[in-house]
């Protein structure tokens, strides 16, 4: 049987043949490189100063030597405002010293991928101070960039909560930036120039950075508080006395060897040094689970439920104002900020960790307490503010009448001094407010009268 093809059919076949021949002769495009696996991290530790890593170091040793995890580190500052136990180097010179100390300490545990944000060391306890001096937006941009570069499964960082303890504002700022980056790094609209492909990656003067959005799976926090009961049941804990099967020594010993590189920050006296090391490394490493986007339990291992690979971006709630009515009294400053921050980042459980507290912020036994008088009515109000203090405490400005405009908030800065006789005790400070002859509310602050931190 002979099949006759029409002229049109023969033309189609001829065109197809010619196109196929031309297609076969086209050059292949160069492969599109995947993200650089040299910098892929399992854990990204985000802290403030060289030597901050020591609090998590026993756990990091376990993760590195037993679980073969790759760890990268971001420091917010070089620690240029700290003291120097071994030399006269200060300010920028001390920062240069501490950078080398920090890199050597981490290298002793096999951690080589280390970045510094160039924030100034800012001794204090108010997180808003550090965020201001670091340049909040620019620092966040850098952290998001490094999360996208390292693509960590888990982020470890300082607890973004105001606590009685060292309570360093730089520590808190590191925790804030890490949390914000956790929520933004997977969003291609956040710092979009970072995820734009370069026009010609082998040429100069490109403006697209060629990174990929990346959503970490978990974020855990650790704290510089001087008491630990509020951390119980909030996340996994790791004994520092456990012996590493691969190294034959305790994880505390591995951390101590690393920490010995930070000589500028350690006591020169051997007895004092041992006491200092024991103070920090005798306790277990306690984590608070911030957020998990994979299945697992609060107390489960850090990597419980984590499997390698990208996951979709999960948006946080973002800021939503809470409708309020009438007149109210609340703590201001960092306490006010954290109330909004926790809600915006789906961290409502952090508000339940502990009631408002602080420790004396200087050798003069003083404490600073910011207060806010809110007027959410349509008329101006006269508000009387009084304090209820333990015996012997002194306060400025003391009882006073405040005129608060309609739909306005009046910030009050209370400064108090505790008597020497109450050292090493917990005390309670209360403020009450009334308007139109009626009480409108009160706030209470627990204060540890035991100087153990930087000035407020």
Tell me what each language-model feature is:
Residues 10-23:
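Bacterial N-terminal signal peptides
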Residues 25-46, 129-130, 136-346:
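Metal-dependent de-N-acetylase/amidase catalytic core
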Residues 25-150, 172, 179-183:
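Active-site rim/loop-helix segments in enzyme catalytic domains that contact anionic ligands
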Residues 364-378:
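Short beta-strand elements of extracellular/lumenal beta-sandwich folds
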Residues 403-405, 417-423:
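Short, surface-exposed loop/turn segments at beta-strand-coil junctions that are enriched for proline
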């Amino acid at each position: 049987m002979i099949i006759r093809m029409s002229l049109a059919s023969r033309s189609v076949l001829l065109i197809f043949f010619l196109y196929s021949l031309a297609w076969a002769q086209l050059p292949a495009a160069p492969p599109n490189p995947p993200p650089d696996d040299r910098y892929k991290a399992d854990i990204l530790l985000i802290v403030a100063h060289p030597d901050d890593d020591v609090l998590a170091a026993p756990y990091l040793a376990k993760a590195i030597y037993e679980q073969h995890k790759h760890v990268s580190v971001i420091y917010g500052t070089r620690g240029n405002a700290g003291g120097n136990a071994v030399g006269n180097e200060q300010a920028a010179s001390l920062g240069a010293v501490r950078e080398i100390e920090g890199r050597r300490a981490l290298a002793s545990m096999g951690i080589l991928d280390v970045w510094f944000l160039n924030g100034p060391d800012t001794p204090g306890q108010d997180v808003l101070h550090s965020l201001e001096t670091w340049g909040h937006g620019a620092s966040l941009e850098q952290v998001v960039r490094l999360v996208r570069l390292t693509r960590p499964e888990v982020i470890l960082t300082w607890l973004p909560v105001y606590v009685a303890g060292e309570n360093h504002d730089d520590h808190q700022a590191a925790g804030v930036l890490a949390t914000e980056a956790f929520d933004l790094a997977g969003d291609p609209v956040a710092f979009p120039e970072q995820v734009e492909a370069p026009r010609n990656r082998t040429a100069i003067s490109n403006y697209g950075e060629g990174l990929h959005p990346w959503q970490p799976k978990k974020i855990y926090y650790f704290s510089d508080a001087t008491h630990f009961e509020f951390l119980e049941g909030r996340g996994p804990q790791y004994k520092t006395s456990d012996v590493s099967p691969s190294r034959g020594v305790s994880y505390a010993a591995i951390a101590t060897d690393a920490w010995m590189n930070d000589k500028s920050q350690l006591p020169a006296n051997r007895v004092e040094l041992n006491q200092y090391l024991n103070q920090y490394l005798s306790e277990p490493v306690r984590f608070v689970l911030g957020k998990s986007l994979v299945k697992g339990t609060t107390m489960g291992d850090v990597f419980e439920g984590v499997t390698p690979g990208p996951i979709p971006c999960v948006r946080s709630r973002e800021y939503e104002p809470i409708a309020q009515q009438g007149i109210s009294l609340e703590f201001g400053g960092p306490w006010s900020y954290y109330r909004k921050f926790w809600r915006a980042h789906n961290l409502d459980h952090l508000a339940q960790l502990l009631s408002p507290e602080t420790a004396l912020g200087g050798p003069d036994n003083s404490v600073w307490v910011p207060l806010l008088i809110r007027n959410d009515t349509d008329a101006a109000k006269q508000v009387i503010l009084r304090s209820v203090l333990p015996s012997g405490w002194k306060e400025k400005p003391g009882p006073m009448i405040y005129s608060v405009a309609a739909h306005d908030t009046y910030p009050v800065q209370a400064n108090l001094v505790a008597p020497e006789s109450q050292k090493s005790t917990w005390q309670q400070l209360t403020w009450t407010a009334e308007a139109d002859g009626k009480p409108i509310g009160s706030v209470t602050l627990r204060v540890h009268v035991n100087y153990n931190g930087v000035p407020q």
